[in-house]
Regions:
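Extreme N-terminal segment that seeds HTH/winged-HTH DNA-binding domains in transcriptional regulators
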Residues: 1-39, 52, 77-84, 355
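Flexible loop/turn connectors
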Residues: 14, 18, 272-366
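Flexible loop/hinge segments that line or gate small-molecule binding clefts
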Residues: 155-198, 290, 313-325
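Periplasmic-binding protein-like
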Residues: 97, 149-157, 177, 215-218, ...
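Amphipathic helical "hinge" segments at domain boundaries
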Residues: 9-10, 78-150
Length: 366
């Protein structure tokens, strides 16, 4: 495959070749990660992934504070021939890491079921870590590479920009699959729902029910590209339907920190205040199921049980709450399945990145 192979594998091939030729003998120290990264023009995180992979396979050993050395004897049944593309060829446990920020539990469980189902078919095991921010994301990536995992499926953290570690891994052709987000300028494997179309479907549903007094509860547009697309799609559909777009006072942006607290946070005061200031509202659209749950609880608490609520993602049941009348299904189970298929293709040497866009679906509940 030449240069089309993932660069961390090329580093592993180089190290094994030096050992096989006798250039590096048992107990010899190999070049540090920094030098290997410079030699192969890759990031240090990719060089580290290559080294740790060989340590875990018995070819190298690490000594704290000293460096990495050639092991005395390869593991049982090992040879110093070319390393396989992934650990499956050696019969070791095959692992894929899933990194996901704190999201509404129902969405998380559905996505997870799709990932597990497809990985089971492929004979892989799954390691999952829920994270709370970019710093935790970087730490988790490093920890997973140190295990090592064969591929990473990452539901990217909120924010306008990608974690630099993810960008480096993608550029170094490490098997990374992005969920819910795609890089604009760098080709990579990704799977996500058409958020703009989903936002439009929410507005069309409400207009179809004859509702005109509408509020929107969201996160700041910079929170994720998906949120920005949902808001744009929603507003565009209102205009196309002959309804003026929502003014700023009818759009509430809630701090995303509530997603990092628990699966059942307290009702934010700003939601109570928003509903109190707009007694005329007949319906509220929200950009995810967590916000729908909080709006529903607030409406129940305030006696506004006739409020029509629509959201993205299937809502989980919550007592003492006004339940949504409809939601936009992003097919999280299928998203999970596709993410795994993309990972398997990458591990099998498929070098052409794929961008898979899922069509949203409106599900009416009552």
């Amino acid at each position: 495959m030449g240069e089309s192979r993932p660069l961390y594998m090329m580093i592993q091939d180089y190290i094994l070749d030096q050992i096989r030729k006798g250039n590096w003998k048992p107990d010899d120290q190999i070049p540090p990660e920094r030098e290997l990264a410079e030699q192969f023009q890759v990031s240090r995180i990719t060089a580290k992934a290559a080294i740790v992979g060989l340590v875990n396979k018995g070819y190298l050993s690490r000594q704290r504070g000293k460096g990495t050395f050639v092991a005395h004897v390869p593991g049982p049944g090992k040879s110093l021939e070319r390393m396989p593309v992934h650990s499956a060829a050696e019969g070791s446990k095959k692992l894929v890491g899933l990194i996901i920020p704190w999201v509404e539990f129902r969405y998380f469980s559905l996505l997870l079921s799709g990932v597990e189902e497809e990985l089971s078919k492929a004979g892989y095991h799954l390691i999952v870590k829920r994270i709370t921010g970019l710093e935790t994301e970087s730490q988790t990536i490093e920890a997973f590479l140190g295990i090592p995992v064969d591929a990473l499926i990452i539901v990217t953290s909120p924010g306008e920009h990608f974690n630099e570690d993810i960008i480096r891994l993608v550029l170094d052709k490490y098997p990374v699959i992005l969920v819910e987000k795609s890089m604009q300028d760098i080709r990579t494997n990704s799977v996500y729902c058409d958020a703009g179309k989903g936002g439009a479907m929410m507005a069309e549903y409400l207009m179809g029910k004859g509702v005109r007094k509408i509020g929107l509860v969201t996160y700041p547009p910079r929170f994720t590209f998906g949120v920005k697309a949902r808001i744009f799609g929603f507003q565009s559909a209102l205009v196309a339907g002959g309804v003026p777009p929502l003014s700023d006072d009818l759009i509430l942006s809630v701090t995303p920190d509530l997603l990092q607290r628990s699966d059942d946070p307290e009702i934010p005061e700003e939601i109570i205040r928003f509903l109190s200031e707009h007694p005329e509202l007949e319906a509220v659209a929200t950009v995810d199921a967590m916000l729908a749950k909080l709006v529903g609880k607030a409406c129940y608490q305030m006696g506004r049980t006739d409020m029509r609520i629509i959201c993205f993602d299937e809502p989980s049941y919550s007592k003492n709450s006004v339940y949504p009348t409809a939601y936009i299904d992003q097919s999280p189970v299928e998203v999970g399945r596709i993410a795994v298929r993309l990972a398997m293709e990458a591990l099998e040497g498929q070098q052409e990145p794929k961008k898979c866009v899922i069509e949203p679906r409106l599900v009416e509940l009552s």
